[in-house]
């Protein structure tokens, strides 16, 4: 034998099932006031897919920060082990010794402000700015 509470719930379920077949479910019946999917497009048309494919894809936007790489030598940070007294090793970065330096460019008859490693500075003193820039593929006219 069923009690009145369970019979009432069963009657409500059958009446709501009939109303669902006839019309759409309202937000009051679902138990929340606004739709959780409001503002979202669930279906796409073929033109949307074509537009997304045909758009040029750009790599992730890099922050405007000077990278710690020497443009002349290609030197970059080295991952090294920091070894403690107990021989416990932890990784650390050994950065390149980059310096901002104004270098005289003889062919352009002017100073060029560069960010280069101290090793590149020694190489420029030995071989000349034009030779080192040409080998690295750097156009000094832009700087």
From Swiss-Prot:
Interval spanned by the transit peptide: 1-66
Superkingdom of origin: Eukaryota
Keywords attached to this entry: Chloroplast, Plastid, Ribonucleoprotein, Ribosomal protein, Transit peptide
Bilayer-spanning residue ranges: none
Traits of the deletion mutant: Seedling lethality. Albino seedlings unable to grow under photoautotrophic conditions.
One Pfam family cited in the UniProt record for this chain: Ribosomal_L28
Subcellular location: Plastid, Chloroplast
Gene Ontology cellular-component terms listed: chloroplast; chloroplast envelope; chloroplast stroma; endoplasmic reticulum; ribonucleoprotein complex; ribosome
Main location: plastid
SUPFAM superfamilies named among the record's database cross-references: L28p-like (SSF143800)
Gene Ontology MF term list: mRNA binding; structural constituent of ribosome
UniProt-listed GO biological process terms: translation
Family, as annotated: Belongs to the bacterial ribosomal protein bL28 family.
PANTHER family named among the record's database cross-references: 39S RIBOSOMAL PROTEIN L28, MITOCHONDRIAL, LARGE RIBOSOMAL SUBUNIT PROTEIN BL28M
Subunit text: Part of the 50S ribosomal subunit.
Protein name: Large ribosomal subunit protein bL28c
Name of the gene: RPL28
């Amino acid at each position: 034998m069923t009690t009145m509470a369970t019979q009432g719930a069963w009657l409500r379920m059958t009446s709501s099932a009939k109303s669902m077949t006839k019309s759409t479910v309202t937000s009051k019946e679902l138990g929340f006031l606004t739709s959780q999917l409001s503002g979202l497009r669930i279906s796409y048309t073929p033109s949307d897919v074509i537009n997304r494919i045909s758009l040029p894809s750009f790599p992730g936007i890099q922050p405007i920060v000077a990278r710690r790489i020497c443009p002349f030598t290609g030197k970059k940070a080295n991952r090294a082990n920091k070894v403690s007294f107990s021989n416990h090793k932890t990784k650390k970065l050994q950065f390149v010794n980059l310096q901002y330096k104004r270098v005289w460019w003889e062919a352009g008859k002017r100073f060029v402000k560069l960010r280069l490693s101290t090793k590149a500075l020694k190489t420029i003193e030995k071989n000349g700015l034009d030779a080192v820039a040409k080998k690295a593929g750097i156009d000094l006219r832009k700087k």
